[in-house]
Amino acid sequence: MKRNLLISACVGFACSALPASAQISRLVHDADYAIEMSGTASSGDYAPFWLTSNRYGLSSVENNSGYVRGRVQRSTQADSTRLWRVGYGLDLAVPANYTSQAVVQQFYFDVDLRAFRLSVGAKERGESLKNAALSSGGLTQSVNARPVPQVRVELPDFWTIPGTHNWLAVKGHLAYGLFTDNRWQRETHPEGALYSANALYHSKAGFLRIGNEKKFPLSFIGGLEMSAQFGGEAWNVGRRTDDPTFDNSHVNMGHGFKSFWHAFIPGGSDAFDGAYLNNEGNQLGSWHFQLNWKGKDWNLKGYAEHFFEDHSQMFLEYGWKDMLWGVEATLPKNPFVSTVLYEHLRTTDQTGGLYHDATPELGIQISGLDNYYNHSFYGAWQHWGQAMGNPLLLSPVYNENGEIKFKHNRITAHHFGLSGQPLPELSYRLLFSHVRSLGSYEVPNIKPQFANYFMAQADYAPRHFHGLSFSAAVGSNGGSLIGNSFGGMLTLRKTGRF
Protein backbone atom coordinates (compact mmCIF):
# COMPACT_ATOMS: atom_id res chain seq x y z
CA MET A 1 0.00 0.00 0.00
CA LYS A 2 2.80 2.40 0.95
CA ARG A 3 4.61 1.51 -2.28
CA ASN A 4 1.50 2.33 -4.32
CA LEU A 5 1.13 5.66 -2.52
CA LEU A 6 4.79 6.47 -3.18
CA ILE A 7 4.44 5.61 -6.89
CA SER A 8 1.27 7.72 -7.13
CA ALA A 9 3.01 10.65 -5.43
CA CYS A 10 6.02 10.45 -7.78
CA VAL A 11 3.79 10.30 -10.85
CA GLY A 12 1.73 13.24 -9.58
CA PHE A 13 4.85 15.30 -8.89
CA ALA A 14 6.25 14.53 -12.35
CA CYS A 15 3.00 15.56 -14.02
CA SER A 16 2.79 18.79 -12.03
CA ALA A 17 6.43 19.61 -12.78
CA LEU A 18 6.09 18.97 -16.49
CA PRO A 19 4.57 22.36 -17.40
CA ALA A 20 7.28 24.19 -15.43
CA SER A 21 10.08 22.21 -17.06
CA ALA A 22 8.48 22.79 -20.45
CA GLN A 23 8.37 26.53 -19.74
CA ILE A 24 12.03 26.54 -18.73
CA SER A 25 12.95 24.58 -21.85
CA ARG A 26 11.06 27.10 -23.99
CA LEU A 27 12.86 30.04 -22.38
CA VAL A 28 16.27 28.43 -22.88
CA HIS A 29 15.76 27.23 -26.45
CA ASP A 30 14.64 30.68 -27.63
CA ALA A 31 17.75 32.39 -26.21
CA ASP A 32 20.59 33.77 -28.32
CA TYR A 33 24.26 33.65 -27.39
CA ALA A 34 27.30 35.63 -28.50
CA ILE A 35 31.03 35.26 -27.88
CA GLU A 36 33.14 38.26 -28.81
CA MET A 37 36.78 39.33 -28.76
CA SER A 38 37.91 42.87 -29.51
CA GLY A 39 41.21 44.73 -29.45
CA THR A 40 42.25 48.35 -30.05
CA ALA A 41 45.72 49.75 -30.74
CA SER A 42 46.66 53.35 -31.49
CA SER A 43 49.28 56.06 -31.26
CA GLY A 44 49.01 59.36 -29.39
CA ASP A 45 47.76 60.11 -25.90
CA TYR A 46 44.28 58.63 -26.36
CA ALA A 47 42.59 56.05 -28.54
CA PRO A 48 40.60 57.48 -31.47
CA PHE A 49 37.46 59.14 -30.11
CA TRP A 50 34.88 57.20 -32.15
CA LEU A 51 36.55 53.88 -31.28
CA THR A 52 35.75 54.74 -27.67
CA SER A 53 32.51 56.74 -27.63
CA ASN A 54 28.88 55.61 -27.96
CA ARG A 55 29.68 51.97 -27.21
CA TYR A 56 27.62 51.66 -24.02
CA GLY A 57 30.73 52.33 -21.95
CA LEU A 58 32.42 49.05 -22.94
CA SER A 59 35.53 50.80 -24.24
CA SER A 60 38.73 52.45 -23.10
CA VAL A 61 40.46 55.74 -23.89
CA GLU A 62 43.85 54.02 -23.47
CA ASN A 63 46.01 53.43 -26.55
CA ASN A 64 45.97 49.65 -26.28
CA SER A 65 42.98 47.81 -24.86
CA GLY A 66 40.64 44.93 -25.48
CA TYR A 67 38.13 42.52 -24.03
CA VAL A 68 36.66 39.04 -24.18
CA ARG A 69 32.90 39.04 -23.87
CA GLY A 70 30.13 36.48 -23.58
CA ARG A 71 26.41 37.05 -23.42
CA VAL A 72 23.11 35.21 -23.40
CA GLN A 73 19.96 37.13 -24.29
CA ARG A 74 16.33 36.39 -24.96
CA SER A 75 14.07 39.01 -26.50
CA THR A 76 10.47 39.34 -25.43
CA GLN A 77 9.68 39.09 -29.16
CA ALA A 78 10.33 35.36 -28.85
CA ASP A 79 6.93 35.24 -27.10
CA SER A 80 5.21 37.46 -29.66
CA THR A 81 2.12 35.20 -29.78
CA ARG A 82 1.66 35.18 -25.99
CA LEU A 83 -0.04 37.61 -23.62
CA TRP A 84 2.86 37.53 -21.14
CA ARG A 85 6.24 37.82 -22.85
CA VAL A 86 9.54 37.18 -21.09
CA GLY A 87 13.06 38.34 -21.91
CA TYR A 88 16.38 38.34 -20.09
CA GLY A 89 20.06 38.94 -20.57
CA LEU A 90 23.43 38.20 -18.97
CA ASP A 91 26.44 39.90 -20.54
CA LEU A 92 29.92 39.60 -19.00
CA ALA A 93 33.27 40.96 -20.17
CA VAL A 94 36.87 40.56 -19.05
CA PRO A 95 38.70 43.68 -20.28
CA ALA A 96 42.31 44.80 -20.45
CA ASN A 97 43.33 48.42 -19.79
CA TYR A 98 39.78 49.47 -18.81
CA THR A 99 38.44 51.34 -15.78
CA SER A 100 37.65 47.97 -14.14
CA GLN A 101 39.02 44.43 -14.29
CA ALA A 102 35.66 42.74 -14.87
CA VAL A 103 32.42 44.14 -16.27
CA VAL A 104 28.84 43.01 -15.77
CA GLN A 105 27.69 44.88 -18.85
CA GLN A 106 24.10 43.61 -18.81
CA PHE A 107 22.05 41.62 -16.31
CA TYR A 108 18.31 42.13 -16.67
CA PHE A 109 14.86 40.56 -16.74
CA ASP A 110 11.97 41.88 -18.87
CA VAL A 111 8.27 41.06 -18.66
CA ASP A 112 5.85 42.44 -21.27
CA LEU A 113 2.08 42.58 -20.92
CA ARG A 114 0.28 43.96 -23.93
CA ALA A 115 2.07 47.25 -24.74
CA PHE A 116 3.73 47.65 -21.32
CA ARG A 117 7.07 46.36 -20.07
CA LEU A 118 8.62 45.92 -16.64
CA SER A 119 12.41 45.83 -16.94
CA VAL A 120 14.66 45.13 -13.95
CA GLY A 121 18.45 45.35 -14.11
CA ALA A 122 21.25 46.79 -16.23
CA LYS A 123 20.45 46.74 -19.95
CA GLU A 124 21.84 48.43 -23.06
CA ARG A 125 18.95 50.69 -24.05
CA GLY A 126 19.17 52.45 -27.40
CA GLU A 127 18.34 56.03 -28.27
CA SER A 128 14.65 56.95 -27.96
CA LEU A 129 14.46 58.93 -31.20
CA LYS A 130 17.94 59.07 -32.78
CA ASN A 131 19.97 56.73 -34.96
CA ALA A 132 22.38 55.29 -32.37
CA ALA A 133 24.81 54.04 -35.05
CA LEU A 134 25.29 57.44 -36.73
CA SER A 135 24.20 60.19 -34.29
CA SER A 136 26.63 61.95 -31.98
CA GLY A 137 24.20 61.12 -29.17
CA GLY A 138 21.37 62.53 -27.10
CA LEU A 139 22.03 65.38 -24.69
CA THR A 140 20.35 63.88 -21.61
CA GLN A 141 20.63 60.15 -22.31
CA SER A 142 22.75 58.44 -24.94
CA VAL A 143 24.50 55.12 -25.59
CA ASN A 144 27.87 56.43 -24.38
CA ALA A 145 28.06 55.21 -20.77
CA ARG A 146 27.66 51.84 -19.08
CA PRO A 147 24.05 50.87 -18.36
CA VAL A 148 22.68 51.92 -14.96
CA PRO A 149 20.88 49.10 -13.07
CA GLN A 150 17.27 50.17 -12.64
CA VAL A 151 13.64 49.23 -12.21
CA ARG A 152 11.81 50.57 -15.23
CA VAL A 153 8.18 50.64 -16.34
CA GLU A 154 7.78 51.63 -19.97
CA LEU A 155 5.91 51.74 -23.21
CA PRO A 156 8.93 50.73 -25.32
CA ASP A 157 7.19 51.30 -28.65
CA PHE A 158 4.62 53.85 -29.74
CA TRP A 159 1.16 52.76 -28.58
CA THR A 160 -1.83 54.04 -30.52
CA ILE A 161 -4.37 55.88 -28.38
CA PRO A 162 -7.73 54.11 -28.83
CA GLY A 163 -10.28 55.97 -30.89
CA THR A 164 -7.74 58.12 -32.76
CA HIS A 165 -7.61 55.88 -35.87
CA ASN A 166 -3.80 55.61 -35.56
CA TRP A 167 -3.33 59.39 -35.69
CA LEU A 168 -2.10 59.72 -32.07
CA ALA A 169 0.39 57.45 -30.31
CA VAL A 170 2.49 57.68 -27.14
CA LYS A 171 5.59 56.08 -25.66
CA GLY A 172 7.53 56.71 -22.46
CA HIS A 173 9.11 55.32 -19.32
CA LEU A 174 9.60 55.82 -15.58
CA ALA A 175 12.70 54.41 -13.85
CA TYR A 176 14.68 54.44 -10.61
CA GLY A 177 18.15 52.95 -10.31
CA LEU A 178 21.61 53.05 -8.74
CA PHE A 179 24.98 54.25 -10.07
CA THR A 180 27.66 51.57 -9.68
CA ASP A 181 30.94 53.49 -10.06
CA ASN A 182 31.72 54.07 -6.35
CA ARG A 183 35.12 52.39 -6.51
CA TRP A 184 36.13 54.17 -9.71
CA GLN A 185 35.25 57.60 -8.28
CA ARG A 186 37.03 56.87 -5.01
CA GLU A 187 40.23 55.69 -6.73
CA THR A 188 40.24 58.25 -9.55
CA HIS A 189 39.58 61.60 -7.88
CA PRO A 190 42.63 63.66 -6.85
CA GLU A 191 43.10 64.29 -3.15
CA GLY A 192 40.74 66.97 -1.90
CA ALA A 193 38.56 66.92 -5.04
CA LEU A 194 34.82 66.31 -5.16
CA TYR A 195 33.45 62.79 -5.56
CA SER A 196 30.28 60.91 -4.62
CA ALA A 197 29.10 57.39 -3.81
CA ASN A 198 25.85 55.41 -3.68
CA ALA A 199 24.05 58.00 -5.80
CA LEU A 200 20.58 57.04 -6.98
CA TYR A 201 19.25 57.44 -10.51
CA HIS A 202 15.91 58.59 -11.88
CA SER A 203 14.68 58.88 -15.45
CA LYS A 204 11.35 59.59 -17.08
CA ALA A 205 10.17 60.50 -20.56
CA GLY A 206 6.98 60.93 -22.52
CA PHE A 207 6.60 61.33 -26.29
CA LEU A 208 3.55 62.02 -28.45
CA ARG A 209 3.40 61.11 -32.13
CA ILE A 210 0.90 62.88 -34.37
CA GLY A 211 0.36 61.38 -37.80
CA ASN A 212 -0.67 58.27 -39.66
CA GLU A 213 1.91 57.25 -42.27
CA LYS A 214 -0.62 55.05 -44.05
CA LYS A 215 -2.83 58.09 -44.63
CA PHE A 216 -0.33 60.94 -44.92
CA PRO A 217 3.50 60.88 -45.22
CA LEU A 218 4.21 63.67 -42.68
CA SER A 219 4.30 62.96 -38.94
CA PHE A 220 5.46 64.85 -35.84
CA ILE A 221 6.97 63.62 -32.58
CA GLY A 222 7.43 65.81 -29.52
CA GLY A 223 8.18 65.11 -25.89
CA LEU A 224 10.02 65.70 -22.66
CA GLU A 225 12.85 63.65 -21.15
CA MET A 226 14.19 64.22 -17.63
CA SER A 227 16.81 62.55 -15.45
CA ALA A 228 18.23 63.06 -11.97
CA GLN A 229 20.99 62.04 -9.59
CA PHE A 230 19.87 62.02 -5.95
CA GLY A 231 20.61 60.38 -2.60
CA GLY A 232 24.03 59.00 -1.77
CA GLU A 233 27.00 60.78 -0.23
CA ALA A 234 29.49 63.40 -1.37
CA TRP A 235 32.99 64.23 -0.17
CA ASN A 236 35.06 67.42 -0.50
CA VAL A 237 32.05 69.49 -1.51
CA GLY A 238 33.71 72.70 -0.37
CA ARG A 239 32.78 75.65 1.78
CA ARG A 240 29.78 77.82 0.88
CA THR A 241 30.41 81.57 0.82
CA ASP A 242 27.04 82.19 2.54
CA ASP A 243 27.57 79.53 5.27
CA PRO A 244 31.15 79.67 6.65
CA THR A 245 30.28 77.57 9.73
CA PHE A 246 30.56 74.23 7.91
CA ASP A 247 33.03 73.22 5.23
CA ASN A 248 30.81 70.51 3.69
CA SER A 249 33.68 68.03 3.60
CA HIS A 250 31.18 65.14 3.79
CA VAL A 251 27.47 65.38 3.01
CA ASN A 252 24.77 62.72 3.29
CA MET A 253 21.88 63.24 0.91
CA GLY A 254 18.35 61.97 1.52
CA HIS A 255 17.16 58.47 0.61
CA GLY A 256 13.62 58.64 1.96
CA PHE A 257 10.26 58.77 0.23
CA LYS A 258 10.46 62.57 -0.13
CA SER A 259 13.76 62.26 -1.99
CA PHE A 260 12.25 59.79 -4.44
CA TRP A 261 9.26 62.11 -4.87
CA HIS A 262 11.46 65.18 -5.39
CA ALA A 263 13.39 63.26 -8.06
CA PHE A 264 10.08 62.61 -9.83
CA ILE A 265 8.63 66.10 -9.29
CA PRO A 266 11.61 68.46 -8.85
CA GLY A 267 11.48 70.18 -5.48
CA GLY A 268 12.92 70.22 -1.97
CA SER A 269 16.55 71.16 -1.43
CA ASP A 270 19.94 69.55 -0.97
CA ALA A 271 21.60 69.19 2.40
CA PHE A 272 23.47 72.38 3.39
CA ASP A 273 22.14 74.38 0.45
CA GLY A 274 22.42 77.40 2.70
CA ALA A 275 20.20 80.44 2.35
CA TYR A 276 19.67 79.94 -1.39
CA LEU A 277 17.78 76.69 -1.91
CA ASN A 278 17.96 74.62 -5.09
CA ASN A 279 15.93 71.58 -6.11
CA GLU A 280 17.04 68.37 -4.43
CA GLY A 281 19.54 66.38 -6.48
CA ASN A 282 20.99 66.99 -9.92
CA GLN A 283 18.04 67.63 -12.24
CA LEU A 284 18.44 67.85 -16.01
CA GLY A 285 16.52 67.06 -19.16
CA SER A 286 15.67 67.71 -22.80
CA TRP A 287 12.79 68.79 -25.00
CA HIS A 288 12.57 66.75 -28.21
CA PHE A 289 10.97 67.66 -31.54
CA GLN A 290 11.00 65.62 -34.73
CA LEU A 291 9.40 65.77 -38.20
CA ASN A 292 9.31 62.70 -40.44
CA TRP A 293 8.43 62.48 -44.12
CA LYS A 294 8.01 58.91 -45.31
CA GLY A 295 8.32 58.45 -49.06
CA LYS A 296 7.67 55.33 -51.08
CA ASP A 297 11.16 53.88 -50.58
CA TRP A 298 12.93 56.69 -48.77
CA ASN A 299 12.58 58.68 -45.55
CA LEU A 300 13.59 62.17 -44.39
CA LYS A 301 13.81 63.12 -40.72
CA GLY A 302 14.54 66.48 -39.10
CA TYR A 303 14.94 66.80 -35.35
CA ALA A 304 15.91 69.17 -32.56
CA GLU A 305 16.82 68.65 -28.91
CA HIS A 306 17.00 71.41 -26.31
CA PHE A 307 18.92 70.61 -23.12
CA PHE A 308 18.26 72.23 -19.73
CA GLU A 309 19.75 72.10 -16.23
CA ASP A 310 17.09 74.14 -14.41
CA HIS A 311 13.81 76.03 -14.84
CA SER A 312 15.51 78.96 -16.57
CA GLN A 313 16.18 76.79 -19.63
CA MET A 314 13.36 74.29 -19.22
CA PHE A 315 10.99 77.04 -20.26
CA LEU A 316 11.46 80.17 -22.38
CA GLU A 317 12.68 82.59 -19.70
CA TYR A 318 16.09 83.10 -21.34
CA GLY A 319 15.41 81.75 -24.81
CA TRP A 320 16.59 78.49 -26.31
CA LYS A 321 20.03 79.21 -27.78
CA ASP A 322 21.72 75.89 -27.00
CA MET A 323 20.38 73.14 -29.25
CA LEU A 324 21.21 69.97 -31.11
CA TRP A 325 19.80 70.12 -34.65
CA GLY A 326 19.83 67.11 -36.95
CA VAL A 327 18.68 65.83 -40.32
CA GLU A 328 18.73 62.20 -41.45
CA ALA A 329 17.92 60.81 -44.90
CA THR A 330 17.30 57.15 -45.63
CA LEU A 331 17.82 56.65 -49.36
CA PRO A 332 16.20 54.22 -51.81
CA LYS A 333 17.88 50.83 -51.78
CA ASN A 334 21.26 50.96 -53.53
CA PRO A 335 24.68 49.34 -53.10
CA PHE A 336 26.48 52.52 -52.08
CA VAL A 337 24.81 54.70 -49.42
CA SER A 338 21.82 53.78 -47.24
CA THR A 339 21.66 56.60 -44.68
CA VAL A 340 23.14 60.10 -44.43
CA LEU A 341 23.06 62.16 -41.21
CA TYR A 342 24.19 65.65 -40.19
CA GLU A 343 24.01 67.26 -36.73
CA HIS A 344 24.92 70.69 -35.40
CA LEU A 345 25.43 71.08 -31.66
CA ARG A 346 25.81 74.28 -29.66
CA THR A 347 26.19 74.48 -25.86
CA THR A 348 28.07 77.78 -25.49
CA ASP A 349 25.32 80.00 -24.02
CA GLN A 350 24.19 78.17 -20.86
CA THR A 351 21.98 81.24 -20.07
CA GLY A 352 25.06 83.46 -19.87
CA GLY A 353 28.11 83.75 -17.67
CA LEU A 354 26.49 85.45 -14.65
CA TYR A 355 24.62 83.98 -11.68
CA HIS A 356 23.08 85.98 -8.84
CA ASP A 357 20.50 84.96 -6.25
CA ALA A 358 18.10 87.77 -5.39
CA THR A 359 18.91 89.53 -2.10
CA PRO A 360 17.24 92.38 -0.17
CA GLU A 361 19.98 94.68 -1.43
CA LEU A 362 19.69 93.55 -5.07
CA GLY A 363 16.39 91.84 -5.74
CA ILE A 364 17.22 90.66 -9.26
CA GLN A 365 17.48 86.93 -9.94
CA ILE A 366 19.97 86.06 -12.70
CA SER A 367 19.99 82.32 -13.36
CA GLY A 368 23.02 81.93 -15.60
CA LEU A 369 26.13 79.76 -15.36
CA ASP A 370 24.21 76.53 -15.92
CA ASN A 371 27.52 74.61 -16.19
CA TYR A 372 26.16 71.71 -18.24
CA TYR A 373 26.71 68.18 -16.91
CA ASN A 374 28.42 69.45 -13.72
CA HIS A 375 26.98 69.58 -10.19
CA SER A 376 28.20 70.91 -6.84
CA PHE A 377 27.46 67.64 -4.96
CA TYR A 378 27.45 64.86 -7.56
CA GLY A 379 30.38 66.12 -9.59
CA ALA A 380 29.24 65.23 -13.07
CA TRP A 381 26.48 63.60 -15.12
CA GLN A 382 28.61 60.54 -15.85
CA HIS A 383 28.96 56.82 -15.14
CA TRP A 384 32.35 55.13 -14.91
CA GLY A 385 33.96 58.26 -16.37
CA GLN A 386 31.84 58.44 -19.52
CA ALA A 387 29.21 61.11 -20.20
CA MET A 388 25.64 59.94 -19.74
CA GLY A 389 24.73 62.42 -22.48
CA ASN A 390 26.51 63.55 -25.63
CA PRO A 391 30.20 62.50 -25.64
CA LEU A 392 31.32 65.55 -27.66
CA LEU A 393 31.22 67.40 -24.32
CA LEU A 394 34.45 65.69 -23.38
CA SER A 395 33.94 63.05 -20.65
CA PRO A 396 35.69 63.16 -17.24
CA VAL A 397 37.68 60.03 -18.14
CA TYR A 398 39.84 62.32 -20.32
CA ASN A 399 40.86 64.53 -17.36
CA GLU A 400 44.55 63.90 -16.74
CA ASN A 401 44.33 64.96 -13.08
CA GLY A 402 41.36 62.64 -12.40
CA GLU A 403 38.81 65.34 -11.57
CA ILE A 404 35.24 64.15 -12.01
CA LYS A 405 33.90 67.10 -13.94
CA PHE A 406 33.30 68.29 -17.50
CA LYS A 407 35.99 70.81 -18.44
CA HIS A 408 34.84 71.33 -22.04
CA ASN A 409 31.07 71.81 -21.84
CA ARG A 410 30.88 75.00 -23.95
CA ILE A 411 31.24 73.73 -27.50
CA THR A 412 30.00 74.05 -31.05
CA ALA A 413 30.20 70.95 -33.22
CA HIS A 414 29.42 69.66 -36.69
CA HIS A 415 28.86 65.93 -36.96
CA PHE A 416 28.40 63.71 -40.03
CA GLY A 417 27.37 60.07 -40.32
CA LEU A 418 27.13 57.78 -43.34
CA SER A 419 26.24 54.11 -43.68
CA GLY A 420 25.67 51.60 -46.46
CA GLN A 421 25.52 47.94 -47.43
CA PRO A 422 27.36 47.22 -50.69
CA LEU A 423 26.85 43.45 -50.34
CA PRO A 424 24.40 41.30 -48.35
CA GLU A 425 27.26 40.22 -46.08
CA LEU A 426 29.14 43.56 -45.98
CA SER A 427 28.14 46.87 -44.36
CA TYR A 428 29.99 50.01 -43.35
CA ARG A 429 29.62 53.30 -41.48
CA LEU A 430 31.62 56.53 -41.43
CA LEU A 431 31.64 59.16 -38.67
CA PHE A 432 33.30 62.58 -38.62
CA SER A 433 33.02 65.34 -36.01
CA HIS A 434 34.56 68.80 -35.84
CA VAL A 435 34.48 70.37 -32.36
CA ARG A 436 35.33 73.88 -31.17
CA SER A 437 35.64 74.18 -27.37
CA LEU A 438 35.60 77.32 -25.23
CA GLY A 439 36.23 75.27 -22.08
CA SER A 440 33.71 76.14 -19.38
CA TYR A 441 32.59 79.34 -17.67
CA GLU A 442 34.44 78.11 -14.58
CA VAL A 443 37.73 77.54 -16.45
CA PRO A 444 37.50 79.15 -19.91
CA ASN A 445 40.05 78.41 -22.61
CA ILE A 446 42.44 81.28 -23.28
CA LYS A 447 41.75 80.63 -26.95
CA PRO A 448 39.37 78.10 -28.53
CA GLN A 449 40.57 74.52 -28.82
CA PHE A 450 39.65 72.32 -31.75
CA ALA A 451 39.31 68.62 -32.46
CA ASN A 452 38.54 66.46 -35.48
CA TYR A 453 37.35 62.90 -34.88
CA PHE A 454 37.06 60.35 -37.70
CA MET A 455 36.11 56.68 -37.91
CA ALA A 456 35.52 54.18 -40.74
CA GLN A 457 34.11 50.78 -39.81
CA ALA A 458 33.30 47.72 -41.93
CA ASP A 459 31.35 44.66 -40.77
CA TYR A 460 31.58 41.37 -42.64
CA ALA A 461 29.41 38.28 -41.99
CA PRO A 462 30.38 35.54 -44.49
CA ARG A 463 27.31 33.66 -45.65
CA HIS A 464 29.08 30.27 -45.58
CA PHE A 465 29.97 30.62 -41.87
CA HIS A 466 26.63 31.11 -40.17
CA GLY A 467 26.83 33.29 -37.06
CA LEU A 468 30.44 34.33 -37.57
CA SER A 469 31.21 38.01 -38.19
CA PHE A 470 34.22 40.31 -38.32
CA SER A 471 34.45 44.04 -37.69
CA ALA A 472 37.40 46.27 -38.58
CA ALA A 473 37.59 49.99 -37.82
CA VAL A 474 40.18 52.72 -38.18
CA GLY A 475 39.98 56.09 -36.49
CA SER A 476 41.89 59.27 -35.81
CA ASN A 477 41.98 62.28 -33.51
CA GLY A 478 43.32 65.63 -34.63
CA GLY A 479 43.66 69.03 -33.00
CA SER A 480 44.59 70.47 -29.63
CA LEU A 481 41.66 69.19 -27.54
CA ILE A 482 42.86 65.63 -26.88
CA GLY A 483 45.84 65.56 -29.23
CA ASN A 484 46.59 63.58 -32.36
CA SER A 485 46.29 59.83 -32.70
CA PHE A 486 45.62 57.12 -35.25
CA GLY A 487 44.59 53.55 -34.61
CA GLY A 488 42.40 50.60 -35.36
CA MET A 489 40.07 48.09 -33.77
CA LEU A 490 39.37 44.47 -34.70
CA THR A 491 36.41 42.48 -33.41
CA LEU A 492 35.55 38.81 -33.91
CA ARG A 493 32.06 37.62 -32.99
CA LYS A 494 30.23 34.28 -33.01
CA THR A 495 26.47 34.28 -32.48
CA GLY A 496 23.88 31.55 -32.41
CA ARG A 497 20.71 30.26 -30.80
CA PHE A 498 20.33 27.56 -28.18
Where are these regions (language model features)?
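Bacterial Sec-dependent N-terminal signal peptides
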Residues: 1-26, 496-498
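Short loop/turn motifs that connect adjacent beta-strands in outer-membrane beta-barrel proteins
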Residues: 23-32, 74-86, 99, 112-117, ...
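Transmembrane beta-barrel strands of outer-membrane/channel proteins
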Residues: 31-46, 86-94, 111, 118-124, ...
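Surface-exposed strand-loop-strand hairpins of Gram-negative outer-membrane beta-barrel proteins
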Residues: 40-67, 81-84, 88, 95-99
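Transmembrane beta-barrel outer-membrane domains
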Residues: 59-67, 98-104, 113, 144-148, ...
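Surface-exposed loop and membrane-interface regions of Gram-negative outer-membrane beta-barrel proteins
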Residues: 81-111, 125-144
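Internal, well-ordered domain-core segments that constitute the primary functional module
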Residues: 125-240
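Exposed, low-structure sequence patches enriched in small/polar residues
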Residues: 218-227, 233-498
